[in-house]
Amino acid sequence: MRKFADMKLFALLLFPFLVQAQTHNTAKDLLNEVYEHTLALETQHIAFTNTIGAPSNGGMKERSSKGELFAMGEKVRVKTDAFEFLSDGSKAYLIYPEDEEIETTASDEETSLSPADILKNYQSGYSYKMAGKTIGNNGTTIQYVALRPVASEEVKEILIGIDVKSLLLEIYTQYGTNGVKTVFSVDSYEINVPLDKEMFNINSS
């Protein structure tokens, strides 16, 4: 049986240096600001690319896939080629169409794939550091925050890229202690657009 813990790879969709204490607080404050902004959104539609790189024969072997995320309040639906994830706020479902298999669990911040809940997961248990800026493809400034877990056997570092103008997630990169690199990059991000409530119903799958 596949486990919901595997889905935390989504858990997602990364922040000039001051003294250590100052950069820690500045980076965490930015994450909190993005969290509050995301929480206030009525709806979200994100098209993303997920790329996983694993060490292979002295190099990195990568595979990429496309997906979409729809969110309305606490309700979330994620569609990919391999699976669908659905949360109605009380229960979470992991659906594998090819296997005609559905897994069910209680919905909480640990299983949710909503952008707000993913960001909330990083409010404690990590050290934070501002990690430079880049210019995105559309000319926007992307501020990065590096997070290191206080205690983790699986995650070495997480890099979160934030569009400083829109305060929306732009890219999420997770570096595993086993050398695996997982990247979720946002291809398009629409907010407060009309969404059909029925799409968050398990019976619509």
Pin down the residues of each PLM region.
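N-terminal leader/targeting segments and the immediate start of mature chains
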Residues: 19-61, 70-75, 204-205
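A short, surface-exposed beta-strand/turn
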Residues: 65-66, 71-72, 86-88, 158-171
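Sec-dependent N-terminal signal peptides
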Residues: 9-18
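Short, exposed beta-strand/loop patches in secreted or surface proteins that constitute
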Residues: 37, 66-70, 84-85, 129-136
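An acidic-aromatic
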Residues: 66-113, 182
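Bacterial N-terminal signal peptides that target proteins for export
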Residues: 1-10
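Flexible, surface-exposed loop/linker segments and immediately adjacent secondary-structure boundaries
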Residues: 107-139
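Gly/Pro-enriched, hydrophobic low-complexity segments
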Residues: 126-133, 137-204
